[in-house]
Amino acid sequence: MQLTVVLVGIVVLVLAYLSSTGKVYPHGPQALPILGNLVQFRSLQARPDQELLRIAKKYGQLCMLWFGSNPVLIISSPKAAKDMMDQRGAIYSSRPAQNSFRATQWPWRLVTTPTGETFRLLRKIYHNLLGPQQSLHFRRYQDFESKVMLADLLDRPEAFQLGVERFALSVIFSACYQVRLDDLAHPTMTLFYSIWEQMLKYFQPGSLLLDFFPILQRLPKSMQPWLKLANSLRARELRLHRAFLSTLKKQVQNSTAVACFGTMLVKIQEKENISDERACDILAMLIGAGADTTSSYLQTFFKVIALHPNAALKAQKELDRVVGQDRLPTWDDEPNLPYVRAIIKEVHRWAPIGSLGIPHATTDSDVYDGKHIPRNTIVFPNLTALCRDAERYHNPDLFLPERFLGDDLDAYSSALHPDWRVRDHFHYGFGRRLCQGIFVAEASLYIVVSRLLWGFDIAKEEGESLDMDDKLAGLVTKPKPFRVTIKSRAPSYERVMRQERAIAKTDILSFNDVHFV
């Protein structure tokens, strides 16, 4: 009986919505009654990049689909994305109503929090933790862990994907809790992975029936099976983060802690009256988002460079001229390495680590290019199409770092530039939802990419296809396991890398020092 009422209600809503007169909506594939474009969304999940390029080619800059009775807008042109998601950010910066379940289960996380007081407070907190000056404090973690990674690559080049995963996780755990990760196989890390894998099912757009029929959230809790698993995941995740936060607070009390995101947040806790549970949510968001994106980018970098040896050779010539063979590249070298910077930008553009960005939602109706955009529309930036837009990029299907030579803007300045023709890529989002960790992320990418290109030759293995579409689906897309040949460029480079690892020191704790109750 309850299900019948739900279905009838959905039909009524769809008919009422579609019968609105005098409004022209963006074109899109024909929607089925009740189900909307469920079939198309399943195709998107199976072959995201191909489907998104097809959508952009067929429907142009705007495409309207339907999650059940809910309108979904896919934006496929850089100009429209700039106009709508940046310049009209007051309308396009919220999160979908379907996310209310996610926001309730995992509160105080920007990925789920709609616009409002909590969102504004979180933006303020993350800015205080991750701003350009604050991010400089954490370069010591990035420097140390990159040296560990280089030495690991010398000894176990075949495990490069695990090496960059460990690097990314250790940097962000060090920055959040002043605890580093020696080994991905640590039992606590295994627990984190088991939780994250299941959480992915909840955060992937379209993964829940709720995304298509949000009215199901009104059912009795006993009839919502997704709640039980979500509650369990929430409890397990909080237990882990509470232990790390407790370990950090003991260091603060003993005056043995140095500046990190966590110690800064402890000070903010007192000022803003933030509970430990909320502090854990804030730090959990940093770890989940920061580690996954950095690891995915660096794994993708290995594949891209193996496919483009000429670009690697140009970067190595630049590095040898600026840095020489007797030391590692540092951040001080960055202004003098335009080709290395161009490679970093072009990997972002040519091989984005997401197909669709995290969904936004409209808080009011809007009209763009004569098309009506209803209130509560779910809005996705079509990252695949944006990064291959022929109006923005010459020969967009080619990997050409040279296109960014002369572009001296950092990623933050580029993302905020008022001219859509200037922005380098779209990895870091839009408008009020622009990634708060952009300065920390770019510092990690620069120091690792510059040192990898300086010290190693990365080449395609004979018989390995290196298909760029061969990747794991998710909010962030990682390459599936693949093989490349990684060798030090010469004994002189290897000697420097081993010497730097031998003298590199850190005095922060390890995962073994975290105790659970």
Curated annotation (Swiss-Prot):
Topology relative to the lipid bilayer, per the entry, is: Single-pass membrane protein
The entry's family comment says: Belongs to the cytochrome P450 family.
Q: Which species is listed as the source?
A: Polytolypa hystricis (strain UAMH7299)
NADP: present as a keyword of the record? Answer: no
Concerning InterPro entries, the annotation shows: Cyt_P450 (IPR001128), Cyt_P450_E_grp-I (IPR002401), Cyt_P450_sf (IPR036396), Cytochrome_P450_fung (IPR050364)
Per UniProt, heme binds at C435
Its Enzyme Commission number(s) read 1.-.-.-
Q: What is this protein called?
A: Cytochrome P450 monooxygenase polD
Molecular function GO terms recorded = heme binding; iron ion binding; monooxygenase activity; oxidoreductase activity, acting on paired donors, with incorporation or reduction of molecular oxygen
Role noted for this protein: Cytochrome P450 monooxygenase; part of the gene cluster that mediates the biosynthesis of antifungal fernane-type triterpenoid polytolypin. PolD doe not seem to be involved in the biosynthesis of polytolypin. Within the pathway, the triterpene cyclase polA first catalyzes the cyclization of 2,3-oxidosqualene to motiol, polc converts the 4-alpha-methyl group of motiol to a carboxyl group, polB is responsible for appending a hydroxyl group at the 2-alpha position and polE is a dual functional P450, which can catalyze the formation of both the 1-beta-hydroxyl group and 10-beta-carboxyl group.
